[in-house]
């Protein structure tokens, strides 16, 4: 879910070369990482190359948005998620976007770069916040529909806040799962209760696969991811029922306020890329999810048996520049005359238009790193979010005004393509090469 490795290296090493054009081999990186002047030069350089907004957008709905982290069961078999929800308090501090240095180290590992790259990323983005009120109380007096969200390969629970915040601002509770299948750049757990009590984290980093492992391991991972989505749903419904559940994280958020807060008949699953495949796997296994939305799904991890086992409505929202024939053909395997299936493509969009990194840089660097497409990032995410809301209203039976965007589900907008821009008529196209990595997420 992060940009191609060579583009990142070119950009960031170029930044360093401008700041320190001479005697690079003699620089002590640790000493210079601690230099505020060095940091300021890098940040100024990045800003000068940005020429645009670099903030994650606020939700467009009428609700104030709160945010907290929940870990149920401190082990790596438990559930870890970031929760976005309608809030009654708008005076809290914004939420830190990437909360631990280890996540930046995980991103550098995913990029296949030196650990120093993680520290550079931390310097550039470590203080960035999202417009959600940290640990704010839940807005009482309503039962809210629930969305479980699944992140892409190399991502983690915090990197889709623009989607989570917008849904919460329209009256949803959103549980963004952090997967423990080692497809996240990084995640953590506690080895035992005493470690949890003192905050002694044990970190899991992305698993690097050999080519011959791809098919088997990716399928194992998508199955685990689906179970983690279902497990997250079960635990939230337990809390909604009033079951006492201890948050392994020492946070000032009273989970009892979630009691009787969920509309248990209005539950959906959404995911991006590897998370899009997770949506499909989850729908095939858990009928409690009434519908699903797959954002630029990466279909390779799914087994062939899944496609005929999805009775729920399913909506594919694709980017223009990521998709390819083999992937679209697999999406169309989900189609059946008696099942609700929709697909649209956002013109001028790239794979990263669905993730927060598209808002973390301005135009020039954003295009260099393929974090931004030809379409404005705010326009792209707005189209995706509005189309999602219209689909959710239709299939969850919501009494809202989201049907004003029903036309988007059909691709009726100048920035949308109904269906796909990909030609799949050439049947000689090989559906997937032996490694399955011709289009990574």
UniProtKB/Swiss-Prot annotation:
Its EC number is 3.1.1.47. Changing residue 116 to A: Reduces the association with LDL particles. Changing residue 114 to A/Q/E: Impairs the association with LDL particles. Glycans are attached at residues 423, 433. Changing residue 281 to R: In PAFAD; loss of function. Changing residue 273 to A: Loss of activity. Changing residue 108 to A: Activity is higher than wild-type. Changing residue 92 to H: Retains the ability to associate with HDL particles. Changing residue 304 to A: No change in activity. It is linked to Platelet-activating factor acetylhydrolase deficiency: An enzymatic deficiency that results in exacerbated bodily response to inflammatory agents. It can be associated with several disease states including inflammatory gastrointestinal disorders, asthma and atopy. Asthmatic individuals with PAFAD may manifest aggravated respiratory symptoms. Lipoprotein-associated calcium-independent phospholipase A2 involved in phospholipid catabolism during inflammatory and oxidative stress response. At the lipid-aqueous interface, hydrolyzes the ester bond of fatty acyl group attached at sn-2 position of phospholipids (phospholipase A2 activity). Specifically targets phospholipids with a short-chain fatty acyl group at sn-2 position. Can hydrolyze phospholipids with long fatty acyl chains, only if they carry oxidized functional groups. This is Platelet-activating factor acetylhydrolase. The lineage of its organism: Eukaryota, Metazoa, Chordata, Craniata, Vertebrata.
